[in-house]
Amino acid sequence: MRTLPYSESVDSPSAPDPERARGGTETLPRAYLVRSQRERLLEAMLRVAAAKGYEATTVTDVIEVAGVSREAFDEMFESKSACFLEAYDAVFDVLVAHVNSAFESAAGQPWPERIAAGLSALVGLLSIESGIARMAMVEVTAAGDEARARYRAALARFTPFLEEGREYSNQGEELPADTARFAIGGATSMIFDEIRAGRGPELKRILPDLVFAVLMPYLGPEAAEDEMRRVVAASSP
């Protein structure tokens, strides 16, 4: 299974690997060194923010975990927020790609079943990477206006998966223009509540509810409930 970037041991920040430390790096090409340092800083930001929360995270925390100097950090990022946002974008790149892979793997199936496959992939990955899931879905709301705008833009990247819903729906063009945004908002609010309550590892439990929330605006309550029951039956032992 594909995992989120920099996701190893995110439950608690760890000391840097001695081989990553600054000593002995002078002979490496500068382009390689800068790239390596940047990746380590992004990894450290994810680890620390997942463990401590964004507000409690400091640049000192990040550079200590990364094994990178403050000078190097300042050369690459103008602030803690800038580092966080770049790491955040990397996380959502993987989330969207993971959903897309599941959606495309179900090609040939009815649209509601492909939606269920994509949602199953999403909650499966988030439940495994619950620390980073908290950073991506909850801590981002504490990271300032730009981060919240980035969060809204990230959620909008799931809209293309819902476009076929208009063709599949009996209501068709009568559906409001913001139907996809409302459907995504309803589903992500449930995910947010579960993660904030500390139930990130149990996200698969709400998969049927997520399927209903996304499909209901397009199919109506009865058809969406039928699909929800199908998901429950498919996941039963």
Language-model region placement:
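Alpha-helical DNA-contacting segments of helix-turn-helix folds
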Residues: 36, 40, 77, 82-94, ...
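Basic, helix-initiating cap at the start of DNA-binding domains
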Residues: 1-52, 61-65
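Helix-turn-helix
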Residues: 48-82, 86
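C-terminal peripheral helix-coil segments that are non-catalytic and often amphipathic
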Residues: 1-25, 124, 128, 160, ...
